[in-house]
Design a protein with these regions (language model features):
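Bacterial N-terminal signal peptides
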Residues: 9-20
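N-terminal secretory signal peptides that target proteins for export/translocation
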Residues: 1-7
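Short S/T/G/P-rich N-terminal loop/turn motif that feeds into the first structured element of a domain
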Residues: 21-193
Length: 193
């Protein structure tokens, strides 16, 4: 039996998706915040305090200012290596004195408002939270997939990936979780502008 390249590619992508849905790596939560007027620095300081708590519990945090498409929004991004570490961190939060103290302080003098939040899972099961250490310039294209068209969209993403990587981008593909059902986030990352 002869298989053409397109059929082989489809089989590989299908296997990749099947494995990914069971063994997601790089679990991420994104919280988009907007500072109250005159409270931008206070909000960043509060985010830094929370980042230290997350780090002590196995999470990795990045704090990113939006550049295009928003007004003064800050993404607070928490990553875990896998679903098990994510669940462990969530369990720790329930009984954490550090979190109770943090939220008591933050609620007494709020510095911003939560605008949106969502979770996502990297489709590449080899990715870990530590793969995202550092500071990156990135763009995220968010795609809402039509029912039954997931595989076609992922196939297109995978076809474009080597082209973009040859141009210097690092490409990461995420499936949306809570707050982003039916979405795929196609993220292009660069070391600098």
């Amino acid at each position: 039996m002869k298989l053409n390249i397109k059929t082989i590619h489809l089989i590989v992508v299908s296997i990749f998706l099947s494995i990914s849905t069971v063994s997601f790596a790089d679990v991420v939560e994104v919280f988009q915040w907007k500072a109250f007027p005159g409270k931008g620095q206070d909000m960043l300081e509060s985010m830094s305090k929370a980042a230290k708590i997350y780090a002590s519990e196995g999470g990795q945090v990045s704090i990113d200012a939006h550049n295009i498409g928003s007004t003064q929004l800050i993404n607070y991004v928490i990553r875990w290596d896998n679903s098990k570490d994510y669940a462990r961190s969530k369990d720790l939060q329930r009984s954490s004195k550090a979190w109770a103290d943090f939220w008591a302080e933050s609620n007494a003098n709020p510095a911003g408002e939560l605008v949106a939040s969502f979770s996502a899972n990297n489709l590449d099961p080899t990715k870990k939270a530590s793969d995202f250490k550092g500071s990156y310039v990135y763009s995220a294209a968010i795609w809402k997939v039509n029912p039954g068209k997931d595989l076609a969209l992922i196939t297109r993403f995978m076809e474009a990936k080597p082209i973009l990587e040859a141009a210097g981008a690092r490409v990461e593909i995420y499936a949306g979780g809570w707050g982003a059902p039916g979405e795929y986030h196609y993220v292009l990352m660069y070391d600098s502008w």
